[in-house]
């Protein structure tokens, strides 16, 4: 099932008991965060606050608060089915040459589908039903959440930022938080390696001193939103990828103030520009690490136009110590990464980003080990293959007899198959998340790899331990007589 706009997805969630409407007045200042956090930790539904205090616009929260809802947004019922998305991405990133004529013929539909999914431009889009310019532009009229007591100001969190570099044929879609600075100003917090910042840097180089057009879409359809946070191949637009997932082309329209294309079904569109000479101090804000981050200077986004649907819905979230919505999104997208990594490294059995590791700061990988040093090769590959893992600080590699998603198994492997000196890899001066205050220098720190695999000849001179395993025939016999033993086989045993 596909969803052409946010409202159809809301209806689907409500019909399936995955969305709760809250009519009681709730303040976007702190109160929404506390409610959303409690509900998310209880694995509860998405929330639609129908009467935000001092605002007339409803607020949608916890939309992707469970892996199941992320899967539902992509037309799947089970998060494990998201591996199909990963298979598609793996194919698009590095299509294998056909093994013969029949194989070539079988690949034609996928190539044809990929080529036939450019966005579709529509007229009279829903996102431009209401247009505000000049003095009518007032961002304070939006029910922007003030998430934590130490936050400096309200924060736009789910804004889909649309940019284009002067040397690129396609637009970039990225999600960057934006601090409310005034009635028509936001601070655009994009890190230097992100697509929007790279586009801006290219523009400044080619057109020094000129204003850079930017558009932010709020409340787009769920597939387009998720397309902006998946590892789409560089040559493919997020709009085209969203169309592939949806099975039909993404509908877009031209912005009113520039040539950028925006999702036509979005609830709210913010249009404007960034003056290369206007910067402002951003933060502090409570972040996905569970701490308030340091302040830093980022470009100011001046909003010249606000367009929206009639009776728009404001889509929002909060970030904090896991579990939070980004962590749940990470759990779901974990299944997307597995086929992509396996495509490059077939020896990988499974890959896990523990949500308590702030979505990406720790990874655990199980492999079918084939030679000495194999675990270290996989570590280096994981750090370098996808840019999503350039900030991963810790990688643990285990054998295929260890469940990399079970901490009991992983800790057992670390404590029995590792020598701290021999099996620990330390790399200095690597890219680190700017929000990581534990690194000695902002944006630069070290990485650690833990080889918790069984060691082979060349890695050790000692006789290696053999795991204890019960005789299968004995296990089978005990299974057959278990009910007669009168033992409660509850999980507490």
Swiss-Prot record:
Cofactor binding note from Swiss-Prot or TrEMBL: Binds 1 prenylated FMN per subunit.
Single GO molecular function: metal ion binding
Binding positions for prenylated FMN per the UniProt entry: 175-177, 189-191, 194-195
InterPro entries: UbiD, UbiD-like_C, UbiD-like_N, UbiD_bacteria, UbiD_Rift_dom
Alphabetical UniProt keywords: Cell membrane, Decarboxylase, Flavoprotein, FMN, Lyase, Manganese, Membrane, Metal-binding, Ubiquinone biosynthesis
Swiss-Prot/TrEMBL GO biological process terms: ubiquinone biosynthetic process
Cofactor field: prenylated FMN; Mn(2+)
Pathway membership, UniProt: Cofactor biosynthesis; ubiquinone biosynthesis
Subcellular location: Cell membrane
Enzyme class, spelled out: lyase
Cellular component, GO annotation: cytosol; plasma membrane
Quaternary structure, from the entry: Homohexamer.
Protein family according to the UniProt entry: Belongs to the UbiD family.
HAMAP family: UbiD
Name by which UniProt lists this protein: 3-octaprenyl-4-hydroxybenzoate carboxy-lyase
Lineage: Bacteria, Pseudomonadati, Pseudomonadota, Gammaproteobacteria, Alteromonadales
Gene designation: ubiD
